[in-house]
Curated annotation (Swiss-Prot):
PANTHER family: 50S RIBOSOMAL PROTEIN L9. This is Large ribosomal subunit protein bL9. GO terms for cellular component: ribonucleoprotein complex; ribosome. It comes from the Bacteria. SUPFAM superfamilies: L9 N-domain-like, Ribosomal protein L9 C-domain.
Amino acid sequence: MEVILLEKIANLGNLGDKVNVKAGYGRNYLLPQGKATAATPANIAEFEARRAELEKAAAEKKASAETRAAQLAELEVTITATAGDEGKLFGSIGTADIADALTASGVEVAKSEVRLPNGTIRQTGEYDVAVHLHTDVEATVKLIVVAG
């Protein structure tokens, strides 16, 4: 199935690219999410007419992500959790907890934007947490977990 991408999609292409995808991926994900449109002659003409508008919207999204990244880079967030001896937490700190702490400190962050490649945090200490704000913009936040 040939589609025209309406935004940049990781491992697939950039705005305006005409790509071949499996029919299920196109029908069930890209088209309903508004990330692509079928590559018919009418849609191609409509896309070319709207191209400047879509590129401007994509540039605005990236600019807002960069300003959020600059705000996040300056942040140092402390989360208090109950812990036993030797700093082992009762429970864990996940992406939702980190996103809530960042939002409370003034920068709106969704839990899907927080990246924890090693899984949830289960020890007290200092951690560098990656926040993926845009396909091209990633910020690192210093997270301090203390026993409370």
